Amino acid sequence: MAARLCCQLDPARDVLCLRPVGAESRGRSLSGSLGAVSPPSPSAVPANDGSHLSLRGLPVCSFSSAGPCALRFTSARRMETTVNAPRSLPTVLHKRTLGLSGRSMTWIEDYIKDCVFKDWEELGEEIRLKVFVLGGCRHKLVCSPAPCNFFTSA
């Protein structure tokens, strides 16, 4: 089952939001099979229009009508190249959630914001998405049992 989404920049919060196609939004439509998940629990997020979506690896707040709290995401190809050159990005994020990293995350956020629009708008990379929550989001990722805890914020 595929979910059809739009990518929209929210300048008020300076975050990228995913919106189901058909909801009020602007941005490039995304389409891809990202795996199946169970819908988020009603108590976890506000009333939403995402219970029909089949997505893996998104925080439950992604399904909220208000959009995700503080979500940054990029293509899997990018995560395998420049960002990962000096170190593993998941390891860096995991250390940050534990309060172990003293390095600012601004360089990662800037890099991701730069490459998201190039990859999606110019290259059309829509299917192989990897999701990273870089802070400010209290929701856990919706994913199958696996070592996903390093993608959640503290």
Swiss-Prot record:
Any single biological process term in GO: symbiont-mediated arrest of host cell cycle during G2/M transition
| Annotated compartments | Host cytoplasm; Host nucleus; Host mitochondrion
Q: Which GO terms describe its cellular component?
A: host cell mitochondrion; host cell nucleus
What segments bear the compositional bias annotation Low complexity?
Answer: 28-38
Q: Is Transcription regulation one of the keywords UniProt gives this record?
A: yes
**Keywords attached to this entry:** Activation of host NF-kappa-B by virus, Activator, Apoptosis, Host cytoplasm, Host G2/M cell cycle arrest by virus, Host mitochondrion, Host nucleus, Host-virus interaction, Modulation of host cell cycle by virus, Transcription, Transcription regulation
UniProt region (Disordered), positions on chain: 25-49
Q: Which Pfam families match?
A: X
Q: How is it modified after translation?
A: A fraction may be phosphorylated in insect cells and HepG2 cells, a human hepatoblastoma cell line. Phosphorylated in vitro by host protein kinase C or mitogen-activated protein kinase. N-acetylated in insect cells.
- Residue ranges of the region described as Mitochondrial targeting sequence: 68-117
Job of this protein:
Multifunctional protein that plays a role in silencing host antiviral defenses and promoting viral transcription. Does not seem to be essential for HBV infection. May be directly involved in development of cirrhosis and liver cancer (hepatocellular carcinoma). Most of cytosolic activities involve modulation of cytosolic calcium. The effect on apoptosis is controversial depending on the cell types in which the studies have been conducted. May induce apoptosis by localizing in mitochondria and causing loss of mitochondrial membrane potential.
Annotated HAMAP family = HBV_X
Q: Which family does it belong to?
A: Belongs to the orthohepadnavirus protein X family.
Its assembly, as annotated, is:
May form homodimer. May interact with host CEBPA, CFLAR, CREB1, DDB1, E4F1, HBXIP, HSPD1/HSP60, NFKBIA, POLR2E and SMAD4. Interacts with host SMC5-SMC6 complex and induces its degradation. Interacts with host TRPC4AP; leading to prevent ubiquitination of TRPC4AP. Interacts with host PLSCR1; this interaction promotes ubiquitination and degradation of HBx and impairs HBx-mediated cell proliferation.
Name under which the protein is recorded: Protein X
Origin species, per record, is: Hepatitis B virus genotype F1 subtype adw4 (isolate El Salvador/1116Sal/1997) (HBV-F)
